[in-house]
Swiss-Prot record:
Keywords: DNA-directed RNA polymerase, Nucleotidyltransferase, Transcription, Transferase. DNA-dependent RNA polymerase catalyzes the transcription of DNA into RNA using the four ribonucleoside triphosphates as substrates. Its EC number is 2.7.7.6. One of its GO terms (molecular function) is DNA-directed RNA polymerase activity. Belongs to the RNA polymerase beta chain family. This is DNA-directed RNA polymerase subunit beta. It comes from Nitratidesulfovibrio vulgaris (strain ATCC 29579 / DSM 644 / CCUG 34227 / NCIMB 8303 / VKM B-1760 / Hildenborough) (Desulfovibrio vulgaris). GO terms for biological process: DNA-templated transcription. HAMAP family: RNApol_bact_RpoB.
Length: 1372
């Protein structure tokens, strides 16, 4: 049935929101490549194995090669892993091949001697659930995606901060995924240095020489040459080259050869003149003799007669050198082109500084810098240098790094080339030199084109590689120690290093986090989170303001609002609603393509780098009927700046206004009217909302509620078109069409979660929303999850709110709330606490779980069964026994009396202590579940047998329901064929003499439904029909057998016992459901960052009320709005009020019996939507009545962020509902009945109850544990600690002169051990004297001084009297 919902959004979004968990799920699927049958892609797990294998021994006589891997089926399903505290994992088997070679000692050639192939068990790998989580040791965890600096190349400068001269120093860094970092940087003298792996720097030309380049090669690559001729007459001639223009003055008149003068002597040579010189065909121009001085030679100058090197390349040219060269008969000088253009001599200067003569010396020098301890040979140095950047074993740029390198340096290399080439390095230096000489802008390291996401698959892949590399070393050692020809592959491979690395990563890594499971939104948000922290990332202390700040490239990719408030602000962020992560790990956002000012239906996803040159219009830009941009100039984004651009220049357009925010922020209506700080709080606090007893979706929503609820995994969704065969509170069975689940006849059973404990102890339960016989299509909601109503997120309640002060009870954001809210359980939530007790085998004997506990009265045992375990349904309070347990005490020497007692009463009085599991303070609730885990070989107690019988009966019923649904589905498939066909035999009924159908009668649908499925065999006259029925029944039998196998294995698991840790005999887990009603001290919040604590729960009759007698539900402080600047809450209040009143009025019309035509017209008039009008016209009267009846609590409205209801829309609704246009109402005081002096802003606001509940925080102690060292009470509720009396409290008591009270606080109530004992004795005796001793903290201070070599002793002066005793009760 269509829901009557008012949508205020004006922009038609053409793209559905991508599945919110795609990033996690797709990444792990890509890592595992589980379904691939043929050769898998060289990535993920396959890529890791291929990168480490083949493993050869040191003599190359044997090689261990990887063939393939297979992922098996997990031993336990997900619910079992959670209940038993296990990891949800699957076994991995790898097929490897051991090849043994014969090596010819003379030639070194290898010939294969033997090949052994074997499949080996290679440990287990945690599997991801369909919700994107991992179950590790029984708890659901999330691997958070890491946002880190992308591999590739980056050019930076220091903004003049490094050197005192304030000179801007440029640098360049090539970052691989794995291998040595390469840094090039200039110093203040413009010398270019290189660092490898952040070691000592050296002149960069050493690296070029090590690559095999000579001095001349280096100069030729980086500089152009210009030539000068030395005239015998002493003139200096400059050879004209078209691209060598320099703005110098002419030394002599430059003539064109036809008698004309191009440039007169002393005049500057302009670009026009240079063009005329080139066109005139002049080969040389005479220049001043000193022009060449200070330039540098481009080549070695060799005496042609003797072969002597007169001057070397890069030498500076001086007047004397020119004279010597002229005398030696040198007529033409090649010179580096460095003057006048953006080409400095820095590289030539570096070359002069570099003293290494050739490649060998350069490689040895690099080896010496990186390995200073070991003296190298040229061969070792050459091999070491080759392995630095050119070997795939030691260096991996990764496809991302190669992509970024290609993009930045303008190279066209394949992304499969993952090592660094000489050309890459040389091009990088050329770009760096150009940047330095032209003072170009550096790359922005915070730009999302330079930051990439490492999803879960890649993180696990890296860990797997670390484990495999450790294993590789062990395999090589084994190969060299043993005779390989006698070994099998399994003798070499030990998967334990891999298992250890994975266990450490999933259990303790900073990125493997305990899932935030407070509600469905918090789950989804946690999986969409990006963290800049973690291994290989930033640290909180080092991260500066720039990396935390919002960047222009974040638009549509990272939410500018949702981030934590504390020290992690800006380091932990969220993906936006439409964002996707591409194969390279860069975040992409979708845009509609615009051509010549007209919108197209094409959509393309762009990462931040590829968006650079585009002109992007906003989603709300006006578009005419032809799909063209209506305005000639539109607001657009160009390279991060917002400009007014001509419509013909616009190339792209945003998909939706909500694409710039995350899902949490997109759930805040009127977000555009809230201050960003409060919006941040609002989006964070929605994640803390506790699922309530009854969920209620917001009257004022944004349209995102359905997407979040459906994608969260908390709901059960139909997987395709089908029919609901069975539905109750615990199970739904659906038969699907379209070939889904062929092995079970298209029938799928869904078990609903009931009273499931979440990670945050909130109660997760699912409720069916479908009924038997209902026809469903793909994506329909079959069952709602916690905090979800009708497939939409429903985290709070719609309350009638008034903004007014009330006797100071809403001072400082406090909240005044009506008792009705508590009485009707509006904000009541259920929380589930789990307690566990383990019976171990101790040195003194086994612990025992029993009802027979010494020194415990029958009253304490009243709720325990015969096995000593509490019964389900019992109400418990603090200190009640949940599971009785006794532990053997150490045998002591017995007195004759004890021996006599033991002889008389037998073993009853044996030495055992009571170690029963008791309810801790602050917990009061009902036992909802008890699980007993026994060893497989152990004896089962009565409670275990009862649980097994109950579970077996449940499984039997499930099997029967499933088989029945299978039969119903079969009847539906056969009905079209069988109905109307003649029956061959008479069918008897159940009662004697009853006949269902005579022979020859036609088959009817009623008869078909009444007959058992098996009875259809051989029933019809037509042979063809019988054969078709027989074929269908064969399939049916096969499917029933398949189901029987599934249920038999479940029955077997119930009775087979459990794998318990060593030394554990039995384990019992008890779940208590605690009902938490709304209480004074509970934290509540709206969606706009408006939070507060309940200060008073006021009787309903005392609350402010309307003129018709209805009281408000909640009173908020109006002063909480202006300074916080979250005006969205006021707009939500007004729109909610209009929606509630209009819905109530329509429902009243229905109740008063208004004509259907009138009611339909009224509904259309209220909604004013063509879609709703069409829906209303299509509904029959009964469906329409139900739809209008649902509006009784208010019309559900959707106002998307940045595209929501305008002020005019809200006022028109308020006026349509017959209320005052300013949204204010006259209220009356509930205590006196008087009218309040001012009219009050009232309306409906969506309020959440947050998980900061007072019942979980309030704590009191009279006696309890003490610290061993200081003898002071411990701190905190978890330790059952005391209340700290700090120095400020001491000052307060001193100010009041309460000396005896203070003495009591600081001694007997704190750490005076002897005084405590004496106090206890005095209370027992009724004596009221305070006798304070020495506080233990004084002894600690004395010992501290002793450790510093100071001895402190106490001396009493002669003749001094001791102080008089004073009664401590009288001191009060």
């Amino acid at each position: 049935m269509g829901q009557l919902t008012k949508k205020f959004g004006k922009i038609d979004v053409s793209l559905p929101i991508p599945h919110l968990l795609n990033l996690q799920v797709d990444s792990y699927v890509k890592f595992l490549q589980e379904g691939a049958t043929e050769r898998r892609h060289d990535e993920g797990l396959e890529g890791v194995f291929r990168s480490v294998f083949p493993i050869e021994d040191f003599n190359r006589t044997a090689s261990l090669e990887f063939v393939s891997y297979e992922v098996g089926e997990p031993k336990y399903d997900q619910p079992e892993c959670i209940s038993k505290g296990l990891t949800y994992e699957a076994p991995i088997r790898i097929k490897v091949r051991l090849v043994v070679y014969d090596v010819d000692e003379d030639s070194g050639n290898r010939t294969i001697r033997d090949i052994k192939e074997q499949e080996i068990y290679f440990g287990t790998l945690p599997l991801m659930t369909e919700k994107g989580t991992f179950i590790i040791n029984g708890t659901e965890r999330v691997i958070v995606n890491q946002l880190q600096r992308s591999p590739g190349i980056i050019f930076e400068h220091d903004s003049g901060k490094t050197h005192s001269s304030r000179k801007v120093l440029y640098s360049c860094r090539i970052i691989p995924m794995r291998g040595s970092w390469l840094d090039f940087d200039f110093d203040h003298k413009d010398i270019l240095y290189v660092r490898i792996d952040r070691r000592r720097k050296m002149p960069a030309t050493i690296l070029f020489k090590a690559m095999g380049m000579s001095k001349t090669d280096i100069l030729d690559y980086f500089y152009k040459k210009e030539f000068y001729r030395l005239d015998p007459m002493g003139r200096l001639m400059w050879e004209v080259q078209k691209d060598m223009y320099r703005k110098d003055s002419a030394f002599v008149d430059i003539e064109d050869g036809k008698g004309g003068t191009i440039v007169k002597a002393g005049k500057p040579i302009t670009k026009r003149a240079w063009r005329l010189i080139s066109e005139a065909g002049l080969e040389t121009i005479e220049v001043a003799p000193d022009t060449i001085e200070g330039m540098f030679l481009a080549e070695d100058i060799v005496n042609p007669a003797t072969g002597e090197v007169l001057a070397e390349a890069a030498d500076e040219i001086t007047a004397s050198l020119v004279e010597n060269l002229r005398e030696a008969g040198i007529s033409r000088l090649p010179v580096l082109h460095t003057k006048g253009l953006e080409t400095s001599s820095s590289l030539r200067d570096t070359l002069v500084l570099d003293k290494t003569p050739d490649m060998e010396a350069a490689q040895v020098e690099i080896y010496r810098r990186l390995r200073p301890s070991s003296p190298p040979t040229p061969e070792i140095a050459a091999s070491f240098f080759d392995n630095l950047f050119r070997s795939a074993d030691y260096y991996d740029l990764s496809p991302v790094g190669r992509y970024k390198l290609n993009q930045r340096l303008g190279i066209d290399q394949s992304v499969d080339l993952r090592t660094l080439t000489d050309d890459d390095i040389l091009r990088a230096i050329r770009v760096l030199l150009h940047l330095k000489d032209s003072h170009g802008p550096a790359d922005d390291i915070d730009h999302l084109g330079n930051r990439r996401v490492r999803p879960v698959g890649e993180l696990v892949e890296n860990q797997y590689r670390i484990g495999l590399v450790r294993m590789e070393r062990a395999i090589k050692e084994r190969m060299s120690l043993q005779e390989v020809s006698t070994l099998m592959p399994h003798d070499l491979i030990n998967p334990k290093p891999v298992a250890a690395v994975l266990k450490e990563f999933f259990g303790t890594s900073q990125l493997s986090q305990f899932m935030d499971q407070t509600n469905a939104l918090s789950e989804v948000t946690h999986k969409r989170r990006l963290s800049a922290l973690g291994p290989g990332g930033l640290t909180r202390e080092r991260a500066g303001f720039e990396v935390r700040d919002v960047h222009t490239s974040h638009y549509g990719r990272i939410c500018p609002i949702e981030t934590p408030e504390g020290p992690n602000i800006g380091l932990i962020v969220s993906l936006t609603t439409y964002a996707k992560v591409n194969d390279f790990g860069f975040i992409e956002t979708p845009y509609r393509i615009i051509r010549e000012g007209a919108l197209t239906d094409e959509i393309k996803f762009l990462d931040a780098s590829r968006e650079q040159g585009e002109v992007v219009a906003q989603a709300n830009a006006a578009v005419d009927a032809d799909g063209k941009l209506a305005d000639e100039y539109v607001t657009a984004r160009v390279r991060g700046d917002v400009l007014m651009s001509h419509r013909d220049e616009v190339t792209l357009m945003d998909i939706s206004p909500s694409q710039m925010v995350s899902i949490s922020a997109a759930l805040i209506p009127f977000l555009e009217h809230d201050d960003a700080n409060r919006a941040l709080m609002g989006s964070n606090m929605q994640r803390q909302a506790v699922p309530l007893l009854r969920s209620e979706k917001p009257i004022v929503g944004t349209g995102m509620e359905g997407d979040v609820a459906r994608d969260s995994g908390a709901c059960i969704l139909a997987e395709g078109p089908g029919i609901v065969r069975y539905a109750d509170a615990t199970r739904i069975i659906v038969s699907y069409e379209n070939g889904l689940y062929p092995d079970r006849g298209g029938v799928r059973a869904y078990d609903l979660q009931k009273y499931h404990k979440s990670n945050q102890n909130s109660c997760f339960g699912q409720r069916p929303t479908c009924h038997p016989g209902q026809i469903v299509k793909k994506g329909d909601v079959l069952a709602d999850g916690p905090g979800i109503e009708d497939g939409e997120l429903a985290l709070g309640k719609n309350l009638v709110v008034a903004f007014m002060p009330w006797c100071g009870y809403n001072f400082e954001d406090s909240i005044l709330i009506s008792e009705r809210v508590v009485k009707e359980d509006v904000f009541t939530s259920i929380h589930i606490e789990e307690f566990e007790v383990v019976a171990r085998d101790t040195k003194l004997g086994p612990e025992e779980i029993t009802r027979d506990i010494p020194n415990v009265g029958e009253d304490m045992l009243r709720n325990l069964d015969g096995s000593g375990i509490i019964r389900i349904g019992a109400s418990v309070k603090p200190d009640d026994i949940l599971v009785g347990k006794i532990t053997p005490k150490g045998e002591t020497q017995l007195t004759p009396e004890e021996k006599l007692l033991r002889a008389i009463f037998g073993d009853k009085a044996r030495d055992v202590k009571n170690t029963s599991l008791k309810v801790p303070p602050g917990i009061e609730g009902t036992i909802i579940d008890v699980k007993v885990f026994n060893r497989r070989s152990g004896e089962k107690d009565e409670r275990t047998r009862n649980i097994e019988d109950y579970e077996t009966a449940r499984i039997d019923k499930k099997e029967q329901d499933h088989v029945r649904a299978l039969g119903d589905a079969l009847r539906d498939r056969l009905a079209d064929t069988l109905v109307g066909k003649q029956i061959a035999v008479t069918l008897p009924g159940k009662r004697k003499g009853e006949v269902l159908a005579e022979a020859g009668a036609p088959m009817t649908r009623e008869l078909l439904d009444a007959l058992p499925v098996k009875r259809l065999a051989g029933l019809f006259k037509s042979r063809e029909v019988d054969e078709m029925v027989d074929t269908a029944l064969e399939d049916y039998d096969r499917q029933v057998a398949f189901l029987k196998g599934i249920y038999d294995s479940k029955r077997e698991k119930v009775t087979e016992g459990d794998d318990l840790p060593p030394g554990v005999i039995k384990m019992v887990k008890v779940h208590i459901a605690v009902k938490r009603k709304l209480n004074v001290g509970d934290k509540m919040a709206g969606r706009h960052g408006n939070k507060g604590v309940v200060s008073c729960i006021l009787p309903e009759e005392d609350m402010p009320f309307f003129a018709d007698g209805r009281p408000v539900d909640i009173v908020l402080n109006p002063l909480g709005v202006p300074s916080r600047m979250n005006i969205g809450q006021i707009m939500e209040t007004h729109l909610g009020w209009g929606a509630k009143e209009l819905g109530r009025q329509l429902a009243e019309m229905l109740d008063s019996g208004a004509a259907m035509a009138t009611l339909r017209h009224e509904v259309k008039d209220v909604f004013r939507s063509a879609t709703i009008a069409k829906l209303v016209d299509e509904m029959d009267d009964e469906t329409f009545r139900k739809a209008v009846s649902k509006l009784r609590t208010g019309i559900v409205t959707k106002t998307p962020v940045f595209d929501g209801a305008s002020e005019e829309d809200i006022w028109s609704w308020i006026e349509r509902a017959g209320m005052d246009g300013d949204g204010k109402t006259v209220l009356y005081d509930g205590r006196t009945g008087d009218k309040f002096y001012n009219r009050v802003t009232t309306g409906v606001m969506y309020i959440l109850k947050l998980h900061h509940l007072v019942d979980e925080k309030i704590h009191a102690r009279s006696t309890g544990p003490y610290s061993l060292v200081t003898q002071q009470p411990l701190g905190g509720k978890a330790q059952f600690g005391g209340q700290r009396l700090g120095e400020m409290e001491v000052w307060a008591l001193e100010a009041y002169g309460a000396s005896y009270l203070l003495q009591e606080f600081l001694t007997v109530k704190s750490d005076d051990v002897t005084g405590r004992v004496k106090m206890y004795e005095k209370i027992v005796k009724g004596d009221n004297f305070l006798e304070a001793g020495l506080p233990e903290s004084f002894n600690v201070l004395v010992k501290e001084l002793m450790s510093l070599g100071l001895n402190v002793t106490l001396h009493q002066e002669e003749g001094k009297k001791r102080p008089k005793r004073v009664g401590f009760m009288s001191a009060l």
